[in-house]
């Protein structure tokens, strides 16, 4: 099942169209952590942009592209992955109760943490726990990290938990010293080793 969905995901993200999923039904989270909230809600941290991933599956290099919407409030995170045509392909939710992965035309999958869910279903996994802090230009707490900084004291790289995070581009306000407001434009994540081989992810933030 995981292998079949991974191939379908890759085809959709490369623009093959929505025929792979019957009726192209809109995928909405069964347990929406942000139901009833507004985009302007100051209690919600929101990132929106585009992603690309290169990963190894069955000893062959695979790739996927699309857009994403990340919403975060306290311990709750919800990540929506979409194809270039706008179809929602996967919804990942993480809370104190555990992790949920929802795919079109399949029952929700649940586990204590999200990384294994994504790896099994999609063929690659975004480091959701680390991204909560890396998107704020800081190491995640609780584990060792190596940080290299540029002349403006912004991080150039963070090495943590087997990942290297490269801060490639910043917005005009990127010299803001407040980590919660720092203007990250693009970051690349590389995991050279892992159970399923190397993984590279590029995130470009539009807002």
Curated annotation (Swiss-Prot):
It is a lipid-anchor. Its main location: membrane. The keyword Cell membrane does not apply. A lipid is attached at residue 18 (S-diacylglycerol cysteine). One of its GO terms (biological process) is lipoprotein localization to outer membrane. GO terms for cellular component: cell outer membrane. It is found in: Cell outer membrane. A lipid is attached at residue 18 (N-palmitoyl cysteine). Residues 1-17 form the signal peptide. InterPro entries: LolA/LolB/LppX, OM_lipoprot_LolB. It holds the Pfam family LolB. Keywords: Cell outer membrane, Chaperone, Lipoprotein, Membrane, Palmitate, Protein transport, Signal, Transport. NCBIfam families: lolB. Belongs to the LolB family. Monomer. Plays a critical role in the incorporation of lipoproteins in the outer membrane after they are released by the LolA protein. This is Outer-membrane lipoprotein LolB. The lineage of its organism: Bacteria, Pseudomonadati, Pseudomonadota, Betaproteobacteria, Burkholderiales.
């Amino acid at each position: 099942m995981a292998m079949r969905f991974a191939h379908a995901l890759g085809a959709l993200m490369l623009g093959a169209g929505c025929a792979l999923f019957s009726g192209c039904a809109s995928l909405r989270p069964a347990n929406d952590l942000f139901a009833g909230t507004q985009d302007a809600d100051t209690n919600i941290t929101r990132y929106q942009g585009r992603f690309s991933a290169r990963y190894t599956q069955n000893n062959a290099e695979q790739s996927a592209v699309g857009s994403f919407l990340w919403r975060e409030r306290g311990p709750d995170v919800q990540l929506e992955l979409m194809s270039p045509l706008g179809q929602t392909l996967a919804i990942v939710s993480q809370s104190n109760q555990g992790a949920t992965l929802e795919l079109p035309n399949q029952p929700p999958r649940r586990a204590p943490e999200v990384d294994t869910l994504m790896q099994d279903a999609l063929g690659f996994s975004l480091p959701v726990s680390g991204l909560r802090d890396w998107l704020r230009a800081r190491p995640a707490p609780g584990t060792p990290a190596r940080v290299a900084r540029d002349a403006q004291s912004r991080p150039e790289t963070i090495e943590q938990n087997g990942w290297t995070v490269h801060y490639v581009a910043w917005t005009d306000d990127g010299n803001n010293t407040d980590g919660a407001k720092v203007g990250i434009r693009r970051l690349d994540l590389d995991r050279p080793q892992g159970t399923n081989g190397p993984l590279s992810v590029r995130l470009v933030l539009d807002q």
